[in-house]
Amino acid sequence: MLFRSIDQDFRKNWFKKGTGNVRCLKTVDYYTIEENQNVPKDWVTRIPGINMLHVSELYIIAAEALLETNYAKALEYYNAETSSRGLPALKGDVKLTKDMIFNEYHKEMFGEGQVWYNMKRLNKDIISNLDSKTIPASEDIYVIPIPHDEFNYRD
């Protein structure tokens, strides 16, 4: 499980241990509509919806993009994101790595359908939650074949 050893991580509250199963509780986010926004009068002040892009995702993307060219700024973005989740900042001899950023992205985007695309982009192995089996990354897994009709009728 992603949050096994991180007791102070707020995202642990997204899960509930059932009888032998782990269930994800976080499925829909709510957005607060500010009082002076130009919205229809029948809208309630909080609306259900699906995030298109999280601020925390932007911080993780920025940390990954800067990791090799501006380590201090990458660390600043990473620490800003993780501290907003109740985690202590990285300091001292703990060096920020691509794997740490990937794991943080995986935790932050759990259940939102984005992790697979990140795994594909980074060509990561897939570890099954069901039986802990590792499926090696390959084109067979990540590349969808072009249908034959596309070749037959494209001219």
What are these regions (language model features)?
Residues 1:
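His/Glu-based metal-binding/catalytic segments typifying zinc-dependent metallopeptidases
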Residues 4-155:
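Acidic/polar-rich alpha-helix caps and helix-coil junctions
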